[in-house]
Design a protein with these regions (language model features):
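Glycine/small-residue-rich interface belts in oligomeric ring/scaffold proteins
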Residues: 2-43
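Internal, well-folded beta-alpha domain core
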Residues: 27-178
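Hydrophobic alpha-helix position signal
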Residues: 1-2, 79
């Protein structure tokens, strides 16, 4: 979102403040496959090797919630016309279209439970959802307060995860004729 809005890593951290007010949720319509990749950073005398992990072939629905509708609309516009290229972890991992399904008036939990699935799978029994809560969740430190290479900083939020049972064929009711 910050890249889409044109916020640079070394910009004033105050530019991130409106984004820290967003409530965030994710539904994993397709969990994907964990891909292990390694990177070599060449130093003067030695090369550092690091391992990174990515999800391949995953499909997620992301919901943002805010009391500030104009903020959501500006984010939606920026995601459709980003200042900087959008990618997920690596520049070789761009998100697929559509990126924005619209700005709606529902809360994140309702959106995660009612939006049509982005990946159809007749054998799926449930999907995992993760969403921000004000109490009764697990603490995670992933709210970006600064993207600076020298002073990267993250704040805390509370999230809850649950499995959502999927009605694999809501149009077909075998017992409706009995």
């Amino acid at each position: 979102i910050a890249a889409a809005l044109g916020i640079q890593r070394n910009d004033d951290p105050q530019k991130l403040v409106p984004l820290t007010t967003l409530r965030f949720g994710v539904r994993a319509d397709k969990e994907g496959v964990l891909l292990k990749d390694f990177h070599m950073v060449h130093g003067y005398k030695i090369a550092d090797v690091t391992e990174r992990y990515y999800l391949s072939d995953a499909v997620f629905l992301v919901a943002l919630e805010s009391d500030d509708k104009s903020l959501l609309e500006s984010i939606a516009s920026a995601l459709q016309n980003p200042v900087y290229p959008l990618y997920l972890g690596r520049k070789s991992c761009p998100p697929t279209l559509p990126i924005v399904l619209g700005v709606k008036g529902e809360d994140i939990l309702t959106a995660l439970k009612t939006e049509p699935y982005l990946y159809k799978n007749a054998h799926r029994k449930s999907v995992r959802i993760s969403y921000e809560v004000t109490s009764g969740g697990a603490m995670v430190q992933d709210i970006p307060l600064s993207f600076s290479q020298l002073h990267r900083k993250h704040g805390w939020r509370m999230k809850r995860e649950e499995l959502l049972v999927v009605d694999s064929n809501p149009e077909h009711d075998a017992f409706s004729k009995l």
